[in-house]
Amino acid sequence: MFVDQVKIDVKAGKGGDGAVAFRREKFVPLGGPAGGDGGRGGSVILVVDEGLRTLMDFRYRHHFKANSGGNGQNKQMYGRGAEDTFVQVPPGTTVRDADTNELLGDLTEDGQELVIAKGGRGGRGNMHFATAKNSAPEIAENGEPGQERSIQLELKVLADVGLVGFPSVGKSTLLSVVTSAKPKIASYQFTTLVPNLGMVQLDDGRDFVLADLPGLIEGASDGVGLGIQFLRHVERTRVVLHLIEMDDQTGRDPYEDYQQINHELESYDPKILERPQVIVATKMDLPGSAELLAEFKQKLAAAGDTHEIFEISSITHQGVQPLMNKTADLLAETAEFPMGDVEEAQTQKLYQYQPEGPAFNVEQDEDGTFYITGEKVERLFKMSNLDHQDGVMRFARQLRSMGLDEALREKGAHDGDLVAIDNFTFEFVE
């Protein structure tokens, strides 16, 4: 098992702006405000698709954006709400905020959904701001900005296919040819000390996880060499590719190697041999390999062994593609292992109280301008429609009620000093 990780950027849609409008109809002299509300912005939602096995698709697309809501209209008509954007992920995906590492959710069940970027609410139209003192307000809210963040997706991946065989039969070389994995490769035994995994993606869209597992030796089922540690990984694979090298320079008998590996597998767990196993004759580009293979087939037939044999050369790529296609076919016919079979360390969640930050911060620049920052005040600014005088006055009252005037005075602001919020600058008035 290994953890696949990918980082994506998501942005929810902005809410639609509320409208400033008035009824202008015949025989309705006191029409009043009639500006409708903006529509809700679309959210970005992760949804579990049990047909997915990996995070491969996110290697090619990193940005996901939802549409904004429609603006409000005259005659109290609401703007259209935007549709949500759904992003499919495989079961077992853990979702974290990439900046804070906060755990946002664990997605395990097919169809389970998680909102990772919430769409902004629509701004209110001027029909909401009529009062006894102001029956024709030119006040409307802009739509709330949609949530924008970076997300870290993590998937604990079990290998679908395991490469087994004696050390240096070509497992690491084959893995490097069919995936983007870069295992350590050399012509001596026990090059691979830990499992290397890679994603195989076929032209027809099928994909699976292939594991290059440490080489077996006699007595592995009793713990010799890498022993039990290796066999535990084989136990979790659904298809076994048994690699036998056809190299007459090693002085080894391919059939004896084949029998010995299967004996170790059976000694550890007889059920392993019940899984689909394909014999892969490697290094078929070497002189004398054809003769060795013919002898191997004769011994196999004499023993009544009917396992299918694929001849490959990882150097020339001979026979590699048919082998991968056959492997994908076998996986389609073989049941998956439940995620619960994997032993997980028990972890205790610790929840800490996070006090809400200040509504705003005031800092004075070298040029004397006072800059106002803070999530709450910036959100208020973005939702304020400052195209009309009524909207400007309402925004000023809201800032005053938040205590901004007093905070500016404490920082030394005087009448006429410049104050900036985001890209909006105004003069401080005592």
Curated annotation (Swiss-Prot):
Highest taxon of source: Bacteria
Keywords: Cytoplasm, GTP-binding, Hydrolase, Magnesium, Metal-binding, Nucleotide-binding
MF GO annotations: GTP binding; GTPase activity; magnesium ion binding
Residues of the OBG-type G domain: 159-332
Broad class of where this protein is predominantly found: cytoplasm
Cofactor requirement: Mg(2+)
HAMAP family: GTPase_Obg
Chain ranges passing through the membrane: none
Family that this chain belongs to: Belongs to the TRAFAC class OBG-HflX-like GTPase superfamily. OBG GTPase family.
Quaternary context: Monomer.
Annotated ranges, domain OCT: 352-430
Record's protein name: GTPase Obg
Primary role: An essential GTPase which binds GTP, GDP and possibly (p)ppGpp with moderate affinity, with high nucleotide exchange rates and a fairly low GTP hydrolysis rate. Plays a role in control of the cell cycle, stress response, ribosome biogenesis and in those bacteria that undergo differentiation, in morphogenesis control.
